[in-house]
Every structure is written in C-alpha cells, then in structure tokens.
C-alpha cells in the first residue's frame, strides 16, 4: 500500500539557528542571551584547522558552564572527510554532559554518512551511561546529498532537522555564482520586457522539504550571506516559509530578529486560520464538506492548512 501516515516533526520552535565560531568564546554569552531558538556552536568552516582543538575545548567549557536557558543547543562538527570529526564526537559526548542537545553533521552525501556518526555516538552513549539521546541535524550541501536526500532523511531515528548549505551546494553543482543564498542577478525570468529575479535554491529547498515532511523532520533554510541586506534576508526567508521550511540560519546577530519575524505566524494569519476552522466547524454541523470564507472556497484540506498555522503559533507562544 502506498499510503502511510505522515509522522509529525519534533514539536519545538526552530525559527532561527544562530551560528558562532568555537574559536571566539567571547561571543558565547551573547548567543545564550539572544532570541534564537537554536544555538549552533561551530567547529567546522568558521574555525581554522590550527584552532580546531582549542575551539572544541572552548565549546565544551561553555556547554558545561553557561546558562543556555531554553535554547536548543547544537554543535556543528567537522565533516567526515576530515581528521577532526571523530575527536569532535568523542570529546563532546564524553565531556560536555547532558546539556548538549544535538550535533550538526555537515556535507552529508548519503545515509551511510549518518550511520557512521550514529554508530560512534551510540557506542559512547552506552559506555558513558548517557540517558538523554543526542539528536542530529544534517546539512545537504552537495550534488550527492540532494540526489540521496530521501534516504538521508530516513537514515536515523536521531535525525530531527535538515538544512541546505547554499555555498558548498553551489560549488558542488557547478553553479556560476559566488552568492550565499538569495536571488542571483543572472537567474531571472522575462516578463513584459522586465527582469524578475528568482533564486536557484528553491528546487533543492522543495526536495528537502518533501523528504523532511515524509519522515517527520524539521526542514530548515541555510545561510543568507549578505548580512547588510535585511530585505533580501526577509525575502529569502518568506520564500522558504512558503515552501514549508520552519526556520533559517543566522550568521550575524542582526538576522535573529528577522528570522523570528518571518517564521512566527502573524496575528492576522492566526486569526484567519482560526476563522477558517470555525467556518468549517459550522459547515460540518450543517452536513456540508465545504463553505465560503471571505469569498473563497474552503474545504477539508483547508482545515489541515489552517491547523499548521495555529499549531505553529501555539508552540512558539508556549
């Protein structure tokens, strides 16, 4: 049978994931005090090779020593193609304690990549008697990753989220751009003699969303590199939200408020969703499967759409 129930994703806010390099511990307290739902302390791209060991020590000290409040606390480890990743996993699991919620696995190209990390994590958890299972977020940032996105989404019960890493993805795909997310000047459509810029990421985002929703995982948009362009960030985030993504990375503190703004349902949207649910309740009481709301048809499928908005708003306000 082709039909199966679609599992629900983790019920936690994930509007903004704020990144900070492990080599800059002075930033950690500010990150902990930010309005981001998720904190990603980074051991990968933002840390120079010679600084990896010290960055790892900085992060472990901060996880154990700082008050992170209700933040979902994550560490991006180094890629499996480096000599650093296993030490990242071993030291974090053995030294960081239960406050660590998640590790982010970069450059995942197939399910076996996730399995390799899962096997190591599971062995350490058993050896240490860790009772809180560590969750995973993976980053799709290669042609192989997007080609195998569904098998990756199904690869581990630890997997809670999946992001698109735009820069490495663009390089792997041979895309002619140096931009990180957002619209690209040479990627446009012609309409009435004018250019209407689009972005080359939406098809990959849609593939990630479909795989995530099939397997009960949170789909997350990746970085927007130009942190001087607030409107560009908002526009990219709105497109991602429309596709079904639940949040976006922030690579600069000023992007946190922008992400929270876009991925928090507005009062108008929530009110309209509740009104649609009420209208459909009234229709069902009359024995009808559809009704008219503000001049447009709403039916049973509209209930599901409205419930998505209401659930998201209630989860954020809880």
From Swiss-Prot:
It catalyses: (S)-malyl-CoA = glyoxylate + acetyl-CoA; (2R,3S)-beta-methylmalyl-CoA = propanoyl-CoA + glyoxylate; (3S)-citramalyl-CoA = pyruvate + acetyl-CoA. Its cofactor is Mg(2+); Mn(2+). Involved in the ethylmalonyl-CoA pathway for acetate assimilation. Catalyzes the reversible condensation of glyoxylate and acetyl-CoA to L-malyl-CoA and the reversible condensation of glyoxylate and propionyl-CoA to yield beta-methylmalyl-CoA. It is also able to catalyze the cleavage of (S)-citramalyl-CoA to yield acetyl-CoA and pyruvate, although this reaction is not involved in the ethylmalonyl-CoA pathway. Induction: By growth on acetate. Inhibited by EDTA. Homohexamer. Dimer of trimers. Divalent cations such as magnesium or manganese. Mg(2+) binds at residues 141, 168. The gene is mcl1. Pfam families: HpcH_HpaI. PANTHER family: CITRATE LYASE SUBUNIT BETA, LYASE BETA SUBUNIT, PUTATIVE (AFU_ORTHOLOGUE AFUA_4G13030)-RELATED. Belongs to the HpcH/HpaI aldolase family. The keyword Metal-binding applies. Keywords: Lyase, Magnesium, Manganese, Metal-binding. Its EC number is 4.1.3.24, 4.1.3.25. Gene3D superfamilies: Phosphoenolpyruvate-binding domains. One of its GO terms (molecular function) is (S)-citramalyl-CoA lyase activity. InterPro entries: Aldolase/citrate-lyase_domain, Citrate_lyase_beta/mcl1/mcl2, Pyrv/PenolPyrv_kinase-like_dom, Pyrv_kinase-like_dom_sf. It comes from Cereibacter sphaeroides (strain ATCC 17023 / DSM 158 / JCM 6121 / CCUG 31486 / LMG 2827 / NBRC 12203 / NCIMB 8253 / ATH 2.4.1.) (Rhodobacter sphaeroides). This is L-malyl-CoA/beta-methylmalyl-CoA lyase. It comes from the Bacteria. GO terms for biological process: oxaloacetate metabolic process. The keyword rRNA-binding does not apply.
